């Protein structure tokens, strides 16, 4: 009975990520089961990496450039697609986050660009994903984010 409950819980947890490719679901399962990270951390990794892969797919396709990221299906992203991502592509994504990403879409006058702290968190998720693919699973030989620096975060006054 306990095994059944655990299997049911695992299945429902992975169904939450049914909008993602298998390789991303495997990464999230690794962080959940092996690394023991919190559900909130796993959820943030899911959102950050889903946005990253959607952006990459938009940049590499014939879709109109103004296609909303939320409308892009990434379930067909495979290892070859991920292998083709270069450091310059990641710079493009970080630039998009810094200048074009709407900070608060529901506000009457939305600001563009997210904070350095938010960009650093997204870069951390990408770095973790590529470390998993190169070091843990050895599915990739090269890590395009290995030497990327994090955005400078301003310290606030106390």
List each model region and its residues.
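N-terminal core-binding DNA-recognition domain of tyrosine recombinases/integrases
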Residues: 7-11, 25-40, 50-157
